């Protein structure tokens, strides 16, 4: 009995020894799951400064020229540069990238030889409210430049000339406006709407008294 058990134990050890080399080391299995980084070079095809992303036109991969070029996605967070990160259209770049379910995505983007990217001279534009106020619009209720009458926090103010802010006359008889002539007639429609709201009895209940 003992000799049979020893033989079975020895046989089991031999089979285990045969199976052991088939199992891959943990590090090798992990490396196989990670995406392989590839090297490319080319130019910036286009880049949206406001959204912070664009596409590279890869003209060479691992030193081998590509014809036609291949598009590679780029996000501003991957750009090697200081300050505001962006790319200029046609700017020469070198980069590492990977293959993903969405396509080719850049991992790190630099200028030729690993230098900083040049970037675009463009900067994101301000909000529409800032652009609107930069044209010299003012509140027709209090005369403030930082808001419109619809946004004014003050109660309805006494009627006054909306051109020179004088309370001695209305805009129709303003001498300063008359001196400017027809140039003052090109007032946008929303200016007239706000004037009508300021003059309306709903906003000026004291006018009914």
UniProtKB/Swiss-Prot annotation:
Signal sequence span per UniProt?
A: none
Q: What result is annotated for mutating residue 119 to R?
A: Erroneous subcellular location. No positive effect on terminal myogenic differentiation
Pfam families in UniProt? CSD, Lin-28A-like_zf-CCHC_2, zf-CCHC
- Species the sequence originates in: Mus musculus
Query: What's any GO biological process attached to this entry?
Result: cellular response to glucose stimulus
Family annotation (InterPro entries):
CSD (IPR011129), CSP_DNA-bd (IPR002059), Lin-28_RNA-binding (IPR051373), Lin-28A-like_Znf-CCHC_2 (IPR054081), NA-bd_OB-fold (IPR012340), Znf_CCHC (IPR001878), Znf_CCHC_sf (IPR036875)
Which named protein is this?
Answer: Protein lin-28 homolog A
Induction line: Negatively regulated by the microRNA miR-125b in response to retinoic acid.
């Amino acid at each position: 009995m003992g000799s049979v058990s020893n033989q079975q134990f020895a046989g089991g050890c031999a089979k285990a020894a045969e199976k052991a080399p088939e199992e891959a080391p943990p590090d090798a299995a992990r490396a196989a799951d990670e995406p392989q980084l590839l090297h490319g070079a080319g130019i910036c095809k286009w880049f949206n400064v406001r959204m912070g992303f664009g596409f590279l036109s890869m003209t060479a991969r691992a030193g081998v020229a590509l014809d036609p070029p291949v598009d590679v996605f780029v996000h501003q967070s991957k750009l090697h540069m200081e300050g505001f990160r962006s790319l200029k259209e046609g700017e020469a770049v070198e980069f590492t990238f990977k293959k993903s379910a969405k396509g080719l995505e850049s991992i790190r983007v630099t200028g030729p030889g690993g230098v900083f990217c040049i970037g675009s001279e463009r900067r994101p534009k301000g909000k529409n409210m800032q652009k609107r106020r930069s044209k010299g619009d003012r509140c027709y209720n209090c005369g403030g430049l930082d808001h419109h009458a619809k946004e004014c926090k003050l109660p309805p103010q006494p009627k006054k000339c909306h051109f020179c802010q004088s309370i001695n006359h209305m805009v129709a008889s303003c001498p300063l406006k008359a001196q400017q002539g027809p140039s003052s007639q090109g007032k946008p429609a929303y200016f007239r709407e706000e004037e009508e709201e300021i003059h309306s009895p709903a906003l000026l209940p004291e006018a009914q008294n």
